[in-house]
From Swiss-Prot:
Top class in the EC scheme: oxidoreductase
Binding site for NADP(+): 36
Its biological purpose: Catalyzes the conversion of 4-hydroxy-tetrahydrodipicolinate (HTPA) to tetrahydrodipicolinate.
Catalytically driven reaction(s): (S)-2,3,4,5-tetrahydrodipicolinate + NAD(+) + H2O = (2S,4S)-4-hydroxy-2,3,4,5-tetrahydrodipicolinate + NADH + H(+); (S)-2,3,4,5-tetrahydrodipicolinate + NADP(+) + H2O = (2S,4S)-4-hydroxy-2,3,4,5-tetrahydrodipicolinate + NADPH + H(+)
Residues that bind (S)-2,3,4,5-tetrahydrodipicolinate: 155, 164-165
Keywords, comma-separated and alphabetical: Amino-acid biosynthesis, Cytoplasm, Diaminopimelate biosynthesis, Lysine biosynthesis, NAD, NADP, Oxidoreductase
E.C. number: 1.17.1.8
Pathway in which the depicted protein is active: Amino-acid biosynthesis; L-lysine biosynthesis via DAP pathway; (S)-tetrahydrodipicolinate from L-aspartate: step 4/4
One BP term from GO: lysine biosynthetic process via diaminopimelate
One Gene Ontology cellular component: cytoplasm
Residues that, per the record, bind NAD(+): 9-14, 100-102, 121-124
Organism encoding this protein: Wolbachia sp. subsp. Brugia malayi (strain TRS)
Protein name, as recorded: 4-hydroxy-tetrahydrodipicolinate reductase
Length: 264
């Protein structure tokens, strides 16, 4: 029996790619799809929402509750406000939730995860999550003898800075080094000397860059760089679908807060 997956934010850049991945994946079927109120896709078949050539028999809706009620697991890539509505619906219907929504620092996910299975990751790319494991291991080997700098670049419409992915790298390194996570951004008008033990961040924004990340370990003799470049957003969509399948098959009866690190 196929896993019924709902999609919140189906008319967005990520939502469309997730629907495409669901359409081509033989393990799942689309249970429902939500677009924002006022979207031109409301009431239309989801086939047209993802530029698919044929109708799929499911209409795009604005009702988050309806989609959670009819789904085995739901994928959300939206905003903080919409994610809060998703969490409430997930609690009501006991539906596992996968989310890649960022800028949610004020939401206490652990509170909700005590009642329902939630998988949240700032980046659903398998490659980025493999890199995260490598970064942790590098930090353990190198200890506090190296300065750490994290650079990220994204498209010119991205709102959060540094990116959620860059922050996850920083937290993982701080944890491996057993130090407090103190993100540090050096500005051109600052006269402060680089403080030892702080994790530096540099941010670039431009064009349509999907996502570049570089983690550097530097001392006076050498520099080690670990890099990842996302070529297409499909990598995030594919990872999100993989996460949804994993969450439903392995944790649907086990409340908790999971991440892509558990999946790969």
């Amino acid at each position: 029996m196929k896993i019924k997956v709902g999609v919140i934010g189906c008319s967005g850049r990520m939502g469309k790619r997730i629907l495409n991945e669901l359409i081509t994946n033989t393990q799942v079927e689309i249970a429902g799809a939500v677009a924002r109120l006022g979207s031109k896709y409301i009431g239309s078949d989801i086939g047209s929402a993802v530029y698919h050539s044929s109708n799929l028999g499911i209409k795009v809706t604005s009702s988050i509750s309806d989609v959670f009620e009819s789904s085995d697991v739901v994928i959300d890539f939206t905003t903080k406000e919409c994610m809060l509505a998703c969490l409430k619906a997930a609690m009501k219907f006991k539906t596992p939730l996968v989310s890649g929504t960022t800028g949610i620092e004020s939401i206490n996910l652990k509170k909700y995860a005590a009642k329902i299975p939630i998988l949240w990751s700032a980046n659903m790319s398998v490659g980025v999550n493999v890199l995260l494991k490598l970064v942790k291991k590098a930090a353990e080997f190198l200890d506090n003898e190296y300065d750490v700098e994290i650079w990220e670049m994204h498209h010119n419409l991205k709102k959060d800075s540094p990116s959620g992915t860059a922050m996850e790298f920083g937290k993982a390194i701080a944890n491996a080094l057993k130090v407090d996570f103190q993100p540090y951004q050096h500005s051109h008008n600052s006269s402060n000397i680089r403080e030892k033990g702080k994790i530096g961040f540099a941010v670039s924004r431009g064009g349509g860059v999907v996502g570049d990340h570089s983690v550097m370990f530097i001392n006076s003799d050498e520099r080690i760089e670990l890099n990842h470049k996302a070529i297409d957003r499909t990598t995030f969509a594919r990872g999100a679908v993989r996460a949804a399948i994993w969450l439903y098959e392995n944790k649907r009866e086990t409340p908790g807060l999971y991440s892509m690190q558990d999946v790969i």
